[in-house]
Structures are given as C-alpha cells and as structure tokens.
Amino acid sequence: MAQDSTIKPFLEVLSGRRQAVPPIWMMRQAGRYLPEYRELRAKAGGFLDLCFTPEFAAEVTLQPIRRFAFDAAIIFSDILVIPYALGRSVRFEVGEGPRLDPLDTPDMAATLSREADMTKLEPVFEALRRVRRELDSKTALIGFCGAPWTVATYMVAGRGTPDQAPARMMAYRHPEAFAKIIDVLVENSVRYLLGQLKAGADVLQIFDTWAGVLPPREFARWSIEPTRRIVEGVRKIVPDAKIIGFPRGAGALLPSYIEATGVDAVSIDWAAEPSLVREKVQSRVAVQGNLDPLALIAGGAALDRAVDDVLANFAGGRLIFNLGHGIQPETPIPHVEQMIRRVRGSGLRE
C-alpha cells in the first residue's frame, strides 16, 4: 500500500511509530558547507542581518531541503536571539563567534530586562510562515531555542569559552543572581517557542549545547529543571506540542533528563553509550542522532561504517537519523549525499 502523501515520517516517529527508513535531517544543515548559503550570506552582510531578514532566512532554511530532500527543515536563526530581544548587545565577529556585554556579577545580572520585546523576533516568525508555505506535505518544520543554561553561559561570559567556566563560577558563587537570569530565559523561551508554533513550526527543539560541563547536581538544577519548565509552559498552551531536547554531553544523565523534562525525543551526541540509550532512553522516547560529524567529513568506507553503526544501534526502535552535533563547514557535499543514500537504503536491507 502506498504511503499517504500527507504523512510526515518525522512526526510519525515523534508520535510513537517507528519508521522502517528513519527520517533524516542534520543540525546546521543550512550552513557554510553549501555554496548557495555562502553566496546569500555574502549578500546579506552581517549574520544577524541574515537571521532577521525573512526573505533571506527562509531561503537559507529551504536550501538543504531542495538539495537533499531532508525529512525536516529547521528554521535558520540563532540561540542568542532571545538575549537580543531582551535588549542585550549581540554581535557576531567574523572568525570569533558571538560577542555580548557580559552579565558576570549580581549587579550586572540585576540590569537584565524581565520581558523580551517579541516584536524584535517577528522576522523569525515571518520566516517560519514563508517556509511553511513552501514546504511539501511530507516535510516537517522545526522551530527552536537555546536551553536557558546554554544561553546563560554566553550571556555571563560575553562569548563562548572552552568550558564556559564564567557561568559555572557565577552559578556556584551567586546562585540567586544566576537563577534570576535562568528564570528570565525560561519565561521568554516559552513565549518565543509558542510564537514559532503559531507561525507554523511542527516541532520544537531545545539546544543545551553546554549541558555536558555540569556535574550531576548542577545538571539537575540548571539543565533539567529549566527545560522541564519550558516544556510545561509550552504544553500548558499547546498540549500536544512535540518537543526534542538536546542535552549535549549528558551521557549517563540522559535517563534522568527524559524522565524529568517530558520531551518526546532526545538528541544524543556520538559519545553516548548505545546500550544505555537503547535500554534506558529509547524504550521511552524517540532518539535522534548520532553520527560523528568528523566521520561525515572522512567519507568513504569509514562513513559507511559509522552510518551502519548508528542504524545497528538504534534503528530497531524509534530513530531520527542526525549528526551528534552540527555539520562542519569543510564537509564535502558528496559525503552528505553518501550518508543520505546509506540511510535511505537501509529499509531495503531490513
């Protein structure tokens, strides 16, 4: 029997139905490895200009869908748009990444606005509406935000650091002041995600890129609990909202994360222990991941083996095939095509 053309395989997995061929997309799939992205990026000027010009953001979002026919598009934006909407200075320096005015003392934290100006994020919502109109009926649309812990690490330090020590130190020395930053980010992340659902997103992902630097007690307080509050806040308004969590580097704490947060799926990095994930995680929620981005750069037989390992480990349950983190700019496009062929041919090998 032919598959219903209106069914989105990505949403089927999140709704509890394993797919013989796992749906596939990539974190950072709209990015510098694509020549069409680089061309539009140069035309846009600054990175935030690219994010906040709906015509450009929508086009960049759609580029990898046109080229690779992924099962999901993720809106082109950045996790630091909420600090921007809170009135913080956010800049992207070429070759250096984001720069913000640091909130590294209790007095500085006290200057943080409580409520984000959502009109500043209207370009993101408009880009979502444009993409929604262009996607076919089988392709899901993902909206996202950064988890409060990860966003706070950039806000406190004013930049990315190797281990985000400034935020960790502030959380130890001034937990009340740090908690106020987290509270503001929780409240405004809920508002932002609800706006994305209203604009056409099918699914939401919460990126906690720096979760893995936290010890277990702090992980529970600063990663799990804020994420739980966001999920609860979104579902209070949209009870059936589908939400994916990505606590990168959580490792053995993944079972605690899914139990407490209530996410529908969890994205895992390439170092996650397969047996733990199968037994303690995938038995309860869908799993997304977890190809090493360097295997994708390597290509050839090494890439085939790495893809097959992910499928062998997780395709027996509910799996969304993805990378364990974002695709690297130097990744050859033929290697992406090789990965997709390997994954989509897996149903024939069952």
Curated annotation (Swiss-Prot):
Its EC number is 4.1.1.37. The keyword Ribonucleoprotein does not apply. Substrate binds at R28, Q29, A30, G31, R32, D78, Y154, T209, H325. It catalyses: uroporphyrinogen III + 4 H(+) = coproporphyrinogen III + 4 CO2. GO terms for cellular component: cytosol. InterPro entries: UROD/MetE-like_sf (IPR038071), Uroporphyrinogen_deCO2ase_HemE (IPR006361), Uroporphyrinogen_deCOase (IPR000257). The record marks D78 as: Transition state stabilizer. GO terms for biological process: protoporphyrinogen IX biosynthetic process from glutamate. One of its GO terms (molecular function) is uroporphyrinogen decarboxylase activity. It holds the Pfam family URO-D. Gene3D superfamilies: 3.20.20.210. It is found in: Cytoplasm. Keywords: Cytoplasm, Decarboxylase, Lyase, Porphyrin biosynthesis. Pathway: Porphyrin-containing compound metabolism; protoporphyrin-IX biosynthesis; coproporphyrinogen-III from 5-aminolevulinate: step 4/4. Belongs to the uroporphyrinogen decarboxylase family. Homodimer. Catalyzes the decarboxylation of four acetate groups of uroporphyrinogen-III to yield coproporphyrinogen-III. This is Uroporphyrinogen decarboxylase. The gene is hemE.
